[in-house]
Amino acid sequence: MTENRTEGAPEKKTGRKARIMETALRDAHQSLIATRMSTRDMIPVLERMDAVGYWALEMWGGATFDSCMRFLDEDPWERLRVIRSRIRNTKLQMLLRGQNLVGYRHYADDAVREFVKRAVGGGIDIIRVFDALNDLRNMEVAADQVKKEGAHLQLCISYTISPVHTLDAFAEMEIGRAHV
């Protein structure tokens, strides 16, 4: 017999509403068609997506940025301009690989700072920063610049299960993250 632990418990009201962030402009085609959706293919749905009432639309990340240039012969900065011009009521969000930015190697601190400045200046409102190795030092410069630009910062960890990825290790990371 299972026990219902919430039976009789008072309803908890926080006054906060759930906010929904949609990743179709980044992750859907990254997962389904190797990040090959062109900006032209996105345009017909942008205004409808804006009207849904999402809190944010995630439209940029490492693979989308790279694929724009390498496979689609598009300028990812122009993609940002086009999307921002059609998304007027919804925040735009991106996923940033910390010190790797949207690339496949570490970049100098000044490059990280300039990239964040330009992304926010171009219309990105929210930047989710992560490091694939969960090395908080690789998130510090980007996180600092996101805050300086006045954008919304989200720090993320890459979750996995292994002998070194324990609850205690993640708890220590959380303590360190508070200082980033």
Per-region residue spans from a language model:
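N-terminal amphipathic alpha-helix/helix-capping segment at the start of soluble metabolic enzymes
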Residues: T2-I33, S85
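Surface-exposed loop/turn and secondary-structure junction residues enriched for glycine/proline
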Residues: T23-A24, T35-R36, R40, Y107, ...
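Hydrophobic beta-strand segments of well-ordered beta-sheets in folded domains
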Residues: A28, W55-L57, L92
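A short N-terminal beta->alpha junction/helix N-cap motif
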Residues: H29-R40, F71
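Short catalytic helix/loop segments, enriched in acidic residues and glycine
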Residues: T39-R48
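Terminal or standalone catalytic/regulatory effector modules within metabolic enzymes
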Residues: R48-C68
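Active-site beta->alpha loop and helix N-cap motifs at the rims of alpha/beta catalytic domains
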Residues: G61-E174
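Conserved small/polar residues in nucleotide/adenosyl-binding loops
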Residues: A178-V180
